[in-house]
């Protein structure tokens, strides 16, 4: 299992290199680095590994995936789940891997909180953002954290008192059982919920300070589609793509359309190739 140690914590990482002979780039040119930042609790790097990372790598980028602190196969600590900690973890992982040039961050759901704050904290290290159904942007405190905390609070009770992990394992659902056990330990055994409650939204004035290009992709029926519209209004260089007929599960249920949009955007900004399937996709 590939691991790196950053800030004294073990992180599970996976990397995918582009094809060795990439006609889209000169032989002496380093490929762009695209880093994938997943969502909370039941999510991990596998959600990107089986959807976006392979095609992005095949298009000529070096894909970097990692499990957030306490998620997947990364080390779980009792505390340290604030946005600032997540940003420091991200750059710690990149430093451990030797990636110090500006990178492109592809974020899903809560991963957007990490990506946005990373772009604001270290603009010299972030070349661009792809925000997929991402939390973070809001005009007022509590706009998205209240719903998220309510959902996680209910999940915490089910995991702890109904012993969901044991039930899933008992009927042979091993992967889901392991995920539930990890989620139980995370929400009931760490400072995660308290740290989330303290996170401030990224307001319009801060969004206006984002210096890198941003691609925002949201589902038409998503509860947080207004976050995408706020990004479009506030970020100086932002492209918004709303996926018709979709809600929050764009990454899983709209992968092909999402890839078409994202690969064209990366080709324009990062210099990767545009595969035939992406050329046939909808326009930005």
Question: Where are these predicted regions, by residue range?
Answer:
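Conserved HGGG/HGGXW glycine-rich cap/lid loop of the alpha/beta-hydrolase fold
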Residues: 12, 16-73
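Active-site loop/oxyanion-hole signature of alpha/beta-hydrolase fold enzymes
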Residues: 54, 65-104, 260
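Residue in the alpha/beta-hydrolase core beta-strand immediately N-terminal to the catalytic nucleophile
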Residues: 103-104, 127-130
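Gly/Ala-rich beta-loop-alpha elbow adjacent to hydrolase catalytic centers
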Residues: 107, 111, 115
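Flexible "cap/lid" loop of the alpha/beta hydrolase fold
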Residues: 116-120, 129-157
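Conserved alpha/beta-hydrolase catalytic His-Asp/Glu region
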Residues: 140-146, 155-209
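Conserved loop-alpha-helix segment in the C-terminal half of the alpha/beta-hydrolase fold
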Residues: 214-246
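Catalytic active-site module of serine/aspartate enzymes centered on a nucleophile-bearing elbow/loop
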Residues: 238-284
């Amino acid at each position: 299992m590939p691991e790196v140690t950053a800030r004294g914590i073990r992180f599970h990482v996976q990397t995918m290199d582009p094809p060795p002979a990439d006609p889209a780039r000169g032989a002496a040119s380093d490929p762009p680095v695209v880093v994938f930042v997943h969502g909370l609790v039941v999510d991990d790097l596998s959600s990107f590994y089986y959807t976006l990372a392979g095609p992005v790598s095949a298009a000529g980028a070096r894909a970097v995936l990692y499990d957030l602190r306490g998620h997947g196969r990364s080390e779980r600590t009792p505390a340290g789940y604030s946005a600032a900690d997540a940003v420091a973890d991200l750059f710690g992982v990149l430093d451990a891997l030797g990636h110090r040039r500006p990178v492109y961050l592809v974020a899903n759901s809560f991963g957007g909180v990490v990506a946005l704050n990373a772009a604001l904290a270290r603009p010299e290290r972030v070349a661009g953002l792809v925000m997929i159904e991402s939390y973070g942007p809001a005009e007022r405190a509590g706009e998205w954290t209240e719903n998220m905390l309510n959902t996680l609070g209910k999940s915490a009770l089910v995991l702890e008192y109904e012993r969901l992990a044991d039930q899933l394992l008992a009927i042979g659902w091993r992967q889901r059982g392991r995920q539930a056990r990890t989620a139980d330990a995370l929400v009931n055994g760490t400072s995660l919920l308290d740290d989330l409650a303290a996170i401030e939204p990224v307001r319009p004035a801060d969004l206006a300070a984002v210096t890198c290009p941003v691609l925002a992709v949201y589902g038409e029926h998503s509860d947080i589609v207004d976050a995408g519209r706020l990004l479009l209004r506030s970020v100086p260089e932002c492209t918004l793509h709303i996926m018709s007929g979709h809600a929050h599960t764009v990454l899983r249920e709209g992968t092909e359309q999402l890839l078409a949009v994202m690969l064209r955007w990366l080709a324009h900004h990062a210099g990767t190739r545009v595969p035939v399937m992406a050329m046939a996709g909808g326009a930005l």
